[in-house]
Design a protein with these regions (language model features):
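Short, small-residue-biased leader/transition segments that mark boundaries at the very start
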Residues: 2-7
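Aromatic/basic-lined ligand-recognition segments
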Residues: 8, 113-115
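Extracellular-facing segments of soluble proteins and assemblies that are Gly/Ser/Thr-biased and enriched
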Residues: 11-32
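Short connector loops at helix/strand junctions that flank enzyme active sites
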Residues: 13-17, 60, 112
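A short, hydrophobic, proline-anchored segment that marks a local hinge/packing element in signaling
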Residues: 22, 116-122
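A mid-sequence, solvent-exposed acidic-amphipathic segment
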Residues: 33-73
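Long, well-ordered alpha-helical scaffolding segments within enzyme catalytic domains
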Residues: 38-42, 71-93
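Beta-rich nucleic-acid/ligand-interaction surfaces
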Residues: 95-113
């Protein structure tokens, strides 16, 4: 099972905009996902099911870091990433970033959470 990913489009906590991404194995195609989604819609009504879509994420040049600790402490890790970007004459391509969660946040102590932080650079 692949870890789930969140693509954050806003960095302001009070106005979070994000997309949840669940990577699929290579043998799972769009037809299979759409068929499973239709079966799910018939069993259980949920308006959010209309927002589910299948897509691909293109490869990109990124900077990433393994953050260990509470989500609220991520700004320290982002500062380290920004220093690295500056030291290597790169620039951040956009304000959004990805977070890949390696632990279950409901079962892991906050100070032991592991999250890969990633953003695009140019």
């Amino acid at each position: 099972l692949f870890p789930y990913t969140t693509l954050f489009r806003s960095l302001i906590k009070e106005n979070l905009r994000y997309t949840l991404v669940i990577r699929q194995p290579d043998f799972v195609g769009e037809d299979g996902v759409c068929a499973a989604l239709e079966r799910t819609k018939h069993r259980k009504q949920n308006p959010l099911l209309e927002e589910v879509r299948f897509g691909t994420v293109p490869g990109e040049t990124c900077v990433q870091l393994l953050h260990v600790g509470a989500y609220d402490d991520e700004p320290v890790s982002f500062a380290k990433m920004d220093e690295f970007v500056h030291a290597h004459s790169l620039t951040r391509a956009e304000d959004c970033h990805r977070e890949i969660y390696l632990n279950n946040a409901t079962r892991t102590e906050k100070n032991r959470l592991k999250t890969i932080l990633r953003y695009r650079v140019k």
